[in-house]
A protein has these predicted regions:
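Extracellular/virion structural assembly segments
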Residues: 1-133, 138-187
Length: 187
């Protein structure tokens, strides 16, 4: 299992794109809810559905869950989407240019870490807006060349959001489970 900042990275791919919700505070005005808008980071709740093919894979899920002591220890999960489309960058550089970064939402507000091709992870230090593109500055130099085909995912620091894990029998040998993760920022 790959580690980053002394935490495990869990690469198990969910069945479908995860459901992500934000925990915004709100107040009631009459019978209506009004969200308190804030530009500060909000802890996201990420819900993944998994299909477990056999008992050995089920035991892997259980041991990982028990190792993290449910809600106690944090770890990283990738976003399982190509979050950034990069322009070509050489190895050994600490910044790279991007044409697509989903800037209105996550890059300025949420993201702290990126993982490249599931081999190298680094912390995002700064994002600079330069005319038609953005430049992302990393803490560590890139160990390999990147281009538009490089898979660049957000790396999210999370904990399990429940104290138990439940598997439901599906078919002759498979099991289904749903895991909720809560984002943690400063651990």
């Amino acid at each position: 299992m790959m580690k980053y900042l002394n935490k495990d990275i869990w690469f198990k791919a969910p069945l479908i794109k995860p459901k992500i919700t934000l925990n915004n505070n709100y107040f009631l005005v009459g019978k209506n809810r009004q969200t308190k808008w804030s530009i500060t980071p909000n802890a996201r709740i990420i819900s993944h559905n998994y299909y477990v093919h056999d008992l050995s894979e089920l035991r892997e899920f259980e041991s990982f869950f028990n190792d993290k002591k449910a809600r106690v220890k944090s770890f990283f999960i990738p976003s399982h989407t190509k979050d950034i489309i990069s322009l070509k960058a050489a190895s050994g550089v600490t910044s790279f240019k991007v044409i697509s970064s989903n800037k209105p939402f996550w890059i300025y507000n949420q993201t702290r870490h990126l993982i490249f091709n599931r081999k190298f992870a680094s912390q995002v230090l700064d994002i600079k807006q330069i005319q038609d593109y953005e430049e992302i500055v990393l803490k560590d130099p890139l160990p390999f060349e990147i281009d538009k085909n490089t898979l660049i995912e957000e790396l999210i620091s999370v904990r399990f959001n429940r104290d138990e894990i439940e598997f439901i029998k599906s078919g002759a040998v498979g099991f289904k489970t749903n895991l909720d993760f809560k984002e943690v920022f400063y651990e």
